Regions:
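Metalloprotease/metallohydrolase-associated module, dominated by Zn2+-dependent proteases
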Residues: 1-37, 53-123
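Short alpha-helix carrying the canonical HExxH Zn2+-binding catalytic motif
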Residues: 35-48
Length: 123
């Protein structure tokens, strides 16, 4: 906090280190940059948690997991391109495809159409 104002933030490890430590789900990419894919997937996970648990003590399940942790490294329904890269999200208004891990939604009306899980790719 700064004075009496709470300042939300997220912390993520050294970005060049993400893909060298196995944080990329695949070493080929649907958009030509698997390093960017690793960063994007992890950032989506952390941003989702910063929105739903900004004080780091708001919501945990019985195992101590935040919402995105419940679906970590689960990617759901995907499409495989001719180069072997999988993708499950296309950025709005672009042709750019990404392979993004899913996040858990408490709304039981929203589920992955294939698995029926509350883990979905956040749009």
């Amino acid at each position: 906090s700064v004075g009496n104002v709470s300042v939300p933030y997220i912390a993520i490890q050294d970005i060049p280190d993400l893909y060298s430590r196995g944080c990329a789900a695949q070493t080929i990419s649907p958009n030509g940059d698997y390093k960017l894919d690793a960063v994007a997937s992890i950032l989506v996970h952390e941003i989702d948690e910063s929105l739903t648990d900004p004080d780091l003590a708001t919501w945990f399940d019985a195992r101590g997991a935040e919402n995105a942790d419940k679906c970590a490294w689960a990617f759901g329904t995907s499409t495989t391109l001719s180069n072997g890269a999988k993708w499950n999200y296309q950025a709005p208004g672009t042709l750019t495809k990404y392979y993004i891990q899913m996040n858990w939604l408490a709304d039981n009306k929203v589920t992955d159409p294939v698995t029926g899980s509350a883990c979905v790719v956040t749009k």
